[in-house]
Structure formats: structure tokens, C-alpha cells
From Swiss-Prot:
Lineage: Bacteria, Thermotogati, Thermotogota, Thermotogae, Kosmotogales
SUPFAM superfamilies documented for this protein: FtsH protease domain-like, P-loop containing nucleoside triphosphate hydrolases
Annotated region described as Disordered, given as residue ranges: 623-645
Family: In the central section; belongs to the AAA ATPase family.
Requisite cofactors: Zn(2+)
EC number: 3.4.24.-
Name of protein: ATP-dependent zinc metalloprotease FtsH
Positions of transmembrane segments: 7-27, 111-131
Location of the protein in the cell: Cell inner membrane
Parts of the chain on the Periplasmic side: 28-110
Organism name: Kosmotoga olearia (strain ATCC BAA-1733 / DSM 21960 / TBF 19.5.1)
PANTHER family: ATP-DEPENDENT ZINC METALLOPROTEASE YME1L1 (PTHR23076:SF97), METALLOPROTEASE M41 FTSH (PTHR23076)
HAMAP family recorded: FtsH
Length: 645
């Protein structure tokens, strides 16, 4: 309901009342009489200038003087200035002098006007105060509720999320199962003398499903779930954060067994005393209150505190000690099997073509986390709806991957034939170098379709399997592949363009990482140069401490330059080797706009030995690759149990 018209009418009546009060007061007090001081009255009496005096019972005194035949002057004397005895003496003297003395009844209206003139302003002030207090204490105001916790409470019957809705983090689920069992049956732990951790910290990159895991624990245990972000505690007023912490924990204890989940706890749990000012602030007071509340738990409380962060290195040590967040669970990005399971979960309830190859999609998305995969499926659903299709097909899902990686296709960006030709040779330079080098990532496809805000085309290379270690030879081959585009421009056109700017930046950074962090320089040896260290609130670019001399810095620069130049020369030699096949490949790419790594390998004569993407599961045919064949965590667990039996 809109309150503005009601407030406007109230304001109108207030203004009208003030106006009438002023008008009435002016009406009854408007006269041209002069208020004279007591001395002037005495002078008029002694000089016998008074010809008439009127005394009102409301205390007013009005007298008329006649200083000449032309005019008379009526004046008022305040009775408070006259004592009763002396005033009566003056009246007697005036009567003796023949002055007309009259006693009259006072003006009652003027009395009420004066009274209202005093009461109405007070009434207006009281009314405005009452109206303001009522508005501030309404449901839409937090003026008097800012000390209450803003945590969202999810009850046990509010569309519970369970472990069946989580995939790709089997180890984390196994660790969290203890928390579920504790919430369901705390006595089972106390019988063995075990103490359930008071706090569980979920650590992992953004989007890996930390919040989803916490909700799944609450759903599995069927207990209330209190969700709050670390930034929700701290407000403008001092002490609000600590008050909200107390209120949150009191609510959780009243609803026990329950779970408190603090997302992004690094917003409030950073190292104390690490701010630029160095002093105590509201954030530290809030953190202290969290520590105190967690110390107040006992085994019978039935409340588990969970938190999530992607910056565990900046958390205060007191927060991580035993008795507080003493259990840390790492939530890693999913592997290829986990990605396939996550894709199936996000495809639930959506009209997906049964022939969709989720294993290929999972292998095309290395490094994707759960949030990325959810976005991928959603993008595919949007594309299917845009094309007026009733089901989501493999084509939409593959295009969605390209949209997530490189942005949407810019079909309206029309390049002239010369620029399109340069882009084609540039991308083929990347691809051919990748095909020829055995340790580079296998080439999956090449396209000259512009995507995103800056990309005019791209070459997609995929690892054949999930990798956790990278060798020096692999890094050098990938470095040469990155510089293959610039090498192709130099050889084919005899000049370079701005298209290789990002390639040079990536190549330089990779070479510097090899020298400074990985000890892969023959000249400088197995030494890590520089140390990442800094205060909590300093920017990332200021956190790398330089612990070497100017001479070493010069040698580092020379070594980085040497690695990049050598990789560039390798790329040039490989492009020159396949120069006779490059023109044919460019014509084919410009015509088709997108070609696979296998097609390019056949054109340049590397069909057998070329390093293009070969599906590791190519021999797995039929329904085993389809979306319906991907197992969820529950199905996988059942399968493991069957194997054990």
C-alpha cells in the first residue's frame, strides 16, 4: 500500500492548522496601540495627559491621551509592571483629576487564541515525533532492528537440498557425512568420547559449490539452516556487528539442532591488526564476538558453524585453532567424471536430447567449476529457446561452451577480406604449431568467427586428460604454440599486427613464471626469485616482495627474453615447414569459418602423427556415452557397495 497520499494529507492539515493559528492570533492582536514602559505611564499620569483609562479583568490596561486637539493616543500598560497598592493610588488620583475610569470584561477569544498559540505548536511537535517513530518501527524500516541478525533462515521443509544434488566433490561429501550424523544423533559421538568439531571451514575456488554443500548438510540432517554473508555483520554504527553475532547465535541455539553458515568469512575474519590504520575497528570487534560465541558452545548445544572462503591464507589464526574452525575441508574443481555428473544434475528437469554426449562436454570444459557448468547448461537452454527448439541438443551445448569461454559470436561484426585473411593465418599459425609439437595441448578446433569484445577468432586446444603437473618441455611447447600466430603473420604478410598483443602478454608472463617461480631457467638455476607476501588490505600488485638485487633482476629479464625469443624461433621454423600447405588451409578455414583439429591435420599432412584432439573414449560407443548413462554420486556409491558385496 502506498503511504505517500496519506502522509501528504496529514502534512496538508498540519500546515493549514498552523496558518489558521497565525491568522487568528493576528486578528485578535492587531491594533495600532503602543505598549509603553512603566516610566512613560507615570509621566502621563503626572502630566495629566490621560483623558480615559479602561481596565480589563483579563489584566490588560488601555488608556487614551490627548496631547493636542488633532489626535488622541491609545496606549497599553502591562499590569505585571505595577504593584496593586501603587496602581490603586494612581487610579484614585486619576479619578480626582476627573479622568474617566472604566472597568470592562476581557476578550475571551483572545485568551483562547493565546492558549491555542501555545498548545498547537506543542501538539504538532508531538504528532510529528509519534508519526516518525511509528514509521521507523514499521516492517520496512531497520532503524530500530539493525542489531538483529539479517541471516536468512531456511527451515527443514523448505525444498531441502541433499547430497543427491551435489556432484564432483565426493571427498568433501564423505567428510561432511560426520556432521550429518552428529546432527541426527549426537549421542553416538559422545558414547565413544569423540568431540564433533565446532566449526567446519570449506575452502575452495569460487563456484565450486561450497554454499551448496552446506545447504546439503542441513538438508540431509533435516535441520534449520541460517545463512549470512560475512559482510552483513559490519554496518555504519559501532557495535552493530557484535550485536548481530550475538543475535544470530541465540537464534541458532533456540532452533537447535541447526547449522550456521557464514559465506565469505574472510570479509570479517581477516588477520586482526592488519589494517592500514593499525587500530581496532568494527570488523575486529565483530570477529572477537564470533570467537567468544564459538567458545561458548558445548557438546550438547547441537549447533554446527560452517563457513566458506577462497582466501584461507588471510584468516586470523585464532579463528582456525582447535575448538573453533578446527576442521578444514578443501573443495576442489571437479575432474572430468565430476563435470559429467554435474552436467547431468543441471540437466535435470530440462528437455535435453538423449543423444547428448556428456563425456565429450566434460572433456571440453577443463577447469570449469559447478557454477560454470550451470551457466553452460543455462546458455544452451537459452539458445534452444531462441531457435524455437523444444529440446536442447549437442549443437546448443557446444556453442554454449564457446560462449562461456570466448563470449557470444559477433555476427554483426563484418571484417573486410584482408583482415579476415590475416585472422585466418594467425589462428592457423597457432594450430599448426600445436599440431607439430607433441607436448602442446592437442588442437580441437579453429574458428575465425569473432566472439566477445576483442576476439576476432580463436584456436581451442584441449588436454587429453585432467592434468595436475606440467613439465618444462610441455610449457616450452605451449609457449611456442602461443607465439605461432605472430610467426605466421611475419612469414605470410611480412609485417605484424596488433592481433598478437594478448599472445605476447601471455607468453611473457609464462616465461617469467618459469624463471621466477618454477626454477626452470638453466642460467639462474632452481631458485624461486621473489616472494608473495603482503598485508591483508594491500592490493595484489603490491604483495610480491622483491628479495633479489638489481643484478639478478637484470639477469631475470634477460632469461625471460631468451626463453620467449627461442620459442618464437621454434614457431617460425614450424610455420615455414608447412608454408606450402598453409594457403590451402587458410582458404578452407575462411570458407567454413570453423574447422576441427582433425580436418586441419588432414590438410597439412599430419593426419597420423598430428597432435590434434582425439577422444579418449572414442571406443566407448552407444548409450554409455549418453546423458542418461552418467552416474550421480548416489548411483556411484551404490555401485561401489555392490562391488564390495
Amino acid at each position: 500500500m502506498d503511504q505517500r497520499p496519506k502522509f501528504g494529507m496529514i502534512l496538508f492539515y498540519i500546515v493549514l492548522g498552523v496558518f489558521l493559528m497565525v491568522a487568528l492570533r493576528g486578528l485578535y492582536t492587531t491594533d495600532t496601540n503602543l505598549s509603553v514602559p512603566y516610566n512613560r505611564f507615570l509621566e502621563d499620569v503626572n502630566d495629566k495627559k490621560i483623558i480615559k483609562i479602561v481596565i480589563y479583568d483579563d489584566g490588560r490596561i488601555v488608556y487614551t491621551t490627548s496631547e493636542s486637539s488633532k489626535r488622541s493616543l491609545e496606549t497599553k500598560v502591562s499590569p505585571q509592571t505595577l504593584s496593586t497598592d501603587r496602581f490603586q493610588n494612581y487610579i484614585d488620583q486619576l479619578v480626582t483629576d476627573g479622568v474617566n475610569v472604566v472597568y470592562e470584561k476581557g476578550n475571551d477569544s483572545l485568551f483562547w487564541v493565546n492558549l491555542l498559540g501555545t498548545i498547537i505548536p506543542l501538539a504538532i511537535i508531538v504528532f510529528i515525533w509519534f508519526f516518525a517513530m511509528r514509521s521507523l518501527s514499521g516492517r520496512n524500516s531497520q532503524a530500530f532492528t539493525f542489531t538483529k541478525s539479517p541471516a536468512k533462515k531456511y527451515l527443514s521443509n523448505d525444498k531441502n537440498v541433499t547430497f543427491k544434488d551435489v556432484a564432483g566433490v565426493d571427498e568433501a561429501i564423505e567428510e561432511l557425512q560426520d556432521a550429518v550424523n552428529y546432527l541426527k544423533n549426537p549421542n553416538a559421538f559422545s558414547q565413544t568420547g569423540a568431540r564433533m568439531p565446532k566449526g567446519i571451514l570449506l575452502v575452495g575456488p569460487p563456484g565450486t559449490g561450497k554454499t551448496l554443500l552446506a545447504r546439503a548438510v542441513a538438508g540431509e540432517a533435516n535441520v534449520p539452516f541460517f545463512y549470512i554473508s560475512g559482510s552483513d555483520f559490519v554496518e555504519l554504527f559501532v557495535g552493530v556487528g557484535a550485536a548481530r553475532v550475538r543475535d544470530l547465535f541465540s537464534q541458532a541455539k533456540a532452533s537447535a539442532p541447526s547449522i550456521i553458515f557464514i559465506d565469505e568469512i574472510d570479509a570479517v575474519g581477516r588477520h586482526r591488526g592488519a589494517g592500514l590504520g593499525g587500530g581496532h575497528d568494527e570488523r575486529e570487534q565483530t570477529l572477537n564476538q564470533i570467537l567468544v560465541e564459538m567458545d561458548g558452545f558445548d557438546a550438547k548445544t547441537g549447533v554446527i558453524v560452517m563457513a566458506a572462503t577462497n582466501r584461507p591464507d588471510i584468516l586470523d589464526h585464532a579463528l582456525l585453532r582447535p575448538g573453533r574452525f578446527d576442521k578444514k575441508i578443501t573443495v576442489d574443481p571437479p575432474d572430468v567424471k565430476g563435470r559429467a555428473e554435474i552436467l547431468k544434475i543441471h540437466m535435470r528437469g530440462k528437455p535435453v536430447d538423449p543423444d547428448v554426449d556428456v563425456w565429450l562436454l566434460a572433456r571440453r570444459t577443463p577447469g570449469f567449476v559447478g557454477a560454470d557448468l550451470e551457466n553452460l547448461v543455462n546458455e544452451a537452454a537459452i539458445l534452444a529457446a531462441r531457435r524455437k527448439k523444444k529440446i536442447i541438443g549437442m549443437k546448443e551445448l557446444e556453442e554454449a561452451i564457446d560462449r562461456v569461454i570466448a563470449g557470444p559470436a559477433r555476427k554483426s561484426r563484418i571484417m573486410n577480406p584482408k583482415e579476415k585473411k590475416i585472422v585466418a593465418y594467425h589462428e592457423l599459425g597457432h594450430a599448426i604449431v600445436g599440431l607439430a609439437l607433441p607436448n602442446a595441448y592437442p588442437v580441437h578446433k579453429v574458428t575465425v568467427i569473432p566472439r566477445g569484445s576483442a576476439s576476432l577468432g580463436f584456436t581451442e586446444s584441449l588436454p587429453s586428460e585432467d592434468r595436475y603437473l606440467v613439465s618444462r618441455s610441455e610449457m616450452l611447447d605451449n609457449l611456442a604454440q602461443i607465439l605461432g600466430g605472430r610467426a605466421a603473420e611475419e612469414i605470410v604478410f611480412g609485417e605484424i599486427t596488433t592481433g598478437a598483443a594478448n599472445d605476447l602478454e601471455r607468453a611473457t608472463q609464462m616465461a617469467r613464471t618459469m624463471v621466477c617461480q618454477l626454477g626452470m631457467s638453466d642460467r639462474l638455476g632452481p631458485i624461486a626469485w621473489g616472494k608473495e607476501e603482503g598485508e591483508v588490505f594491500l592490493g595484489r600488485e603490491l604483495t610480491r616482495m622483491r628479495n633479489y638485487s638489481e643484478e639478478i633482476a637484470s639477469e631475470i629479464d634477460n632469461e625471460v627474453k631468451k626463453i620467449v625469443i627461442e620459442a618464437h624461433e621454434r614457431a617460425r621454423k614450424l610455420v615455414e615447414k608447412f608454408r606450402d600447405k598453409l594457403d590451402k588451409a587458410a582458404e578452407y578455414l575462411i570458407e567454413k569459418e570453423t574447422i576441427t583439429g582433425k580436418e586441419l591435420a588432414e590438410i597439412v599432412g599430419l593426419a597420423e602423427s598430428g597432435n590434434y584432439y582425439r577422444d579418449p573414449l572414442a571406443e566407448t560407443k552407444g548409450s554409455k556415452r549418453k546423458v542418461s548413462a552418467v552416474s550421480t554420486n548416489e548411483e556411484a556409491k551404490e555401485g561401489n557397495e555392490d562391488e564390495k558385496n
